Amino acid sequence: MDKDNQALDELPMMTGSKHANKRLFAAFMIFGLLNNVLYVIILSAALDLVSADTPKGVVALFNIFPALITKVVWPLLSNGKIRYTRRVGFCTICSWFGIITIALSSSLSPRLLGISLASLSSGMGELTFLQLTTTLPTEATSKTALGAWSSGTGFAGVAGAGIWWLLRGLGVKGGLGLSSFLPLFFPITYKYILPPFSHLEASSDSSPYQRLPTSSSLSNNNNFRPPAILISVPSSEYVPQHTPLLSSGFIDRDRDRNRDGEELTDGDKRLMGMRASRLTTQEKMKLLRPLVVRYMLPLCAVYVEEYVINSGVAPTLVFPLPTYGLWSWLFKSPRDYYPFWSLTYQTFVFLSRSSLSLGLPPIPKRLLPLPAIIQFLVLSLLFLQAKTFFFSSPAYTPPADGDGGVDRSITIVFLLICLEGLCGGSGYVNTFYHVGREGSSVSENYDADGENEMGGDRRTLNVTEMEKKAMEREFRIGAVGAADSTGILFASLISMPLEIALCRSQVDQGRTMCREL
């Protein structure tokens, strides 16, 4: 009978937990979509933002470089507790002001300033929300949040191109003016959709993060003795047993509230002041070094390869128009090829970035370089097609332009670009999944006898060390976030001369379609 009553008591908690998980997924999906959609809209609007004699690569450069600087520099310079609420507010204001500046300006310089502000917001947003996934109370909820974020960023590619396609008829002022309302959903989602973290804990049977005792647990258990908290210099005394311990659990998104959204008590703030942890520059460098080869180089390589394909090779993948079959319905003009390759790529990036959300297992850590290896193969084959028409039949190899029918290489290129999108999305979501798990288990910091490297016992793990471990997780995922932007920047420098060289090669062989677009 008691078991039945206990089951009935737990039923509302389980139902509430499932609802909280849905809110968590929706919130991070929206965060990912909002953070990347303006980036895509700006790239899609590049032709309308600059004059005909201005290289379109200027827009791409100003759209990525500020984000890269933010993601490289900020994790190294910032210190102490991350104030997530303030960061979300900064991203909202910066993104809105940037897009409004672009919309209301008619000359190049202020538009580039607006693009830079939007890029700065995008870089800070990715850094912030990836770090936020490491603060969730369980491994399962962190995985849910990361999967939703990745799905949102993947869908932003399709959504951004579609939004600008619908709004471009309104012009830059009207189309981007309407788009400026999108950043306002950041604070709305953060405040009203993202659930209190305490509602998420019943959703998982195990948690890699140790929860601090709450005031309610202390008051309801007279025999409970809170763990002694060792305070370093200037005092080596234990904190008295009656010292308040974070009255409602984990510290949430800034230092003034806990994860239930309640104001911290004066005792909580005093305790936080005594145990404030910071990562020194030396500690950050020590954390960063193993990440470079393990995570950053493979992710950077994937991004270099896929953006070289998108910006340097894909514009030259143009074929004689097919006269029958499915391709003849899609390609009515040579200008239709590049948008179709872009849509294909974005669609399969979205699918692969959603792999965790779809319940697919992550690839093992040792196989993280695999997407970059496959991507290099895809790049090589597409380069050969653009350079030598490697897959084309003799009837479609220049100087011949075919005599009706369909060039078989169109289908092969389509399949290769599908694989490109799958590799790019897989590299992103799996890299950040494994980075988020680095250092997530407190037990991994102890030897077989239960002692850590500082000589402490697992049973007396102090609050300062726990907070420092959390900061290390936030730093790791934030630092690795610079790898993708670095790859895009390198790719942009490679792509511009590569596209020119490939087009010149095609013209020399007798096919001038790339020049006529």
From Swiss-Prot:
Keywords: Amino-acid transport, Membrane, Transmembrane, Transmembrane helix, Transport, Vacuole. The keyword Transmembrane helix applies. It is a multi-pass membrane protein. It is found in: Vacuole membrane. One of its GO terms (cellular component) is fungal-type vacuole membrane. The keyword Transmembrane helix applies. It holds the Pfam family CLN3. One of its GO terms (biological process) is regulation of intracellular pH. The chain crosses the membrane at residues 24-44, 57-77, 88-108, 112-132, 146-166, 169-189, 371-391, 409-429. InterPro entries: Battenin_disease_Cln3, MFS_trans_sf. Belongs to the battenin family. PANTHER family: BATTENIN (PTHR10981:SF0). Involved in vacuolar transport and vacuole pH homeostasis. Also required for cytokinesis. This is Protein BTN1. The gene is BTN1.
